[in-house]
Amino acid sequence: MIPLSALITSVTALAHSKVCCVGDVMLDHFHYGTVERISPEAPVPVVRVEREVSMVGAAGNVVRNLIAMGAEARFVTVVGDDSAGTEVGKLFEDLKLEDVPIVDTDRQTSTKTRYIAGVQQILRADHESPFSLVPEIEQQVIERATAVLGQCDSLVLSDYSKGVLTDKALAELISLAAESGKPVIVDLKGRHYARYRGADLITPNRRELTDAT
C-alpha cells in the first residue's frame, strides 16, 4: 500500500504540473425533481423537474479533477456538430480551458441524461456514436495532442470506448510521450489492455481488472 505521506506529496505536486488529457468527453445532464404521481399514459412515474445541472463527464471528469487538484490541464477531444457539442464548448470556457473540442460533423456528442427524484435515479437516457473516428478526424486528434503534449509534463489517456482513442492514436501518442520522457497514465473502461502497451500506469477499478483477467 502506498503511504499516505507519498499520496499527499503526489497530489501537492500536481499544483505545479501541466497535464495533457486526450480522450472521450461526454455531456452529463442531471434533472432533479420530485415524483408525486404515476403517468396516465403508462405505468411510469412523472418527474416534476425543479433543477437542471450540466457538466463534462468521462474524460471531462478527469480534467475537472485535475483542475480541482491545482494542475494546469489541457484537453484534446471530439464532439459532434450539435447542441450538446456546443454546450460542451461552453463548459470548456467555464473551466477556463484554452482548448476547444474538435468537431466531427458525422458524429453525435456523447450525452447521458439522468432524471433523479430525491436520492433515487429514475431514468438514464444515452445519446452517442460509439465508433472509431474517420481518418481525417483521427489525424486532427493526433496532431493537436502532439502539439499540446509538447507543452505538458505528462499524458493522461482517458478511454471510455467511444472512439476518440483509436489504435493508431494510442500507439503514436504513447510512443511520443516515451521518447520525451513523459509519464503516460491510462484511465480506461474496457478490457483490451494490450492497446496501451508502453504506458506507465493503468488505473482499472476492481471490476474492470477482474473482467480483464
Segments predicted by a language model, with ranges:
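Active-site gating loops and adjacent loop-to-helix segments of metal-dependent hydrolytic enzymes
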Residues: A42-P45
